[in-house]
Design a protein with these regions (language model features):
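Solvent-exposed loop segments that connect transmembrane elements
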Residues: 1-3, 50-64, 100-129, 166-183
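Residues that define the transmembrane beta-barrel architecture of outer-membrane proteins
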Residues: 14-18, 71-75, 135-139, 148, ...
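Hydrophobic, well-ordered secondary-structure elements that form the walls
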Residues: 20-22, 79, 90, 139-143, ...
Length: 191
């Protein structure tokens, strides 16, 4: 018997968006000359999709924009102030809101049927497997002093100690109800 499986082809994977990059540099005078640099890098996700043709010819189209890992907006910005041997740095990271794949949203139910997040009544919206997150922003700051042969620096990453969003790990990639692998800070504030 002849086996003819052919080559598995994803057909078309598409990523389309707009990148925005802005850098501003100047020296400002506040009694002493201070070098100022402001930079912003942002990305707007317009399309992230996959078109797949099964061996029987059935075409399956999946759109990912706005879902986990493919938020509509991502951005990073920084402000640097430098004077003499001192340097101050403030960075911000932003991830836009995300939602679960519409096809994977479970019907409302209790923990004894399809939901594994609580024991409420079947119509309780808090019992649905949860896989949505609002926008997320963290700030980090540092200050440093540099001499010819030594350097001293200190900083705080995730200044506000912002946790990643809660989500059901049976719906998205996560551990202990925390989304992992999507750009969220998992370490919390550290110095």
């Amino acid at each position: 018997q002849l086996m003819d499986l052919g080559f598995l082809n994803r057909d078309l994977e598409r990523a389309r968006g707009i990148d925005y990059n802005l850098t501003f540099r100047d020296t400002i005078d506040i009694g002493v000359p201070v070098d100022l640099q402001i930079s912003i890098a942002a990305n707007r996700n317009l399309e992230r999709s996959l078109t797949f043709t099964n061996p029987d010819g059935t075409v399956d189209y999946e759109s990912y924009e706005g879902e986990w890992g493919f938020s509509e907006w991502r951005a990073q910005s920084g402000v640097v102030l430098a004077w003499d041997k001192w340097r101050f740095n403030w960075q911000t990271r932003y991830l836009g809101a995300v939602t679960q794949d519409e096809d994977a949203i479970d019907a409302f139910s209790d923990a004894f049927t399809a939901s594994d997040t609580c024991l409420g009544p079947p119509t309780d919206e808090l019992c649905r497997d949860y896989a949505e997150a609002g926008s997320y922003m963290i700030h980090s700051v540092s200050i440093s002093y540099e001499e010819d042969n030594w350097y001293l620096g200190m900083g705080v990453r995730n200044l506000e100690d912002k946790s990643p969003p809660l989500a059901d790990p049976s719906e998205i990639t996560g551990v202990k109800s925390r989304a992992i692998g999507y750009g969220y800070d998992l370490m919390g504030r550290n110095f």
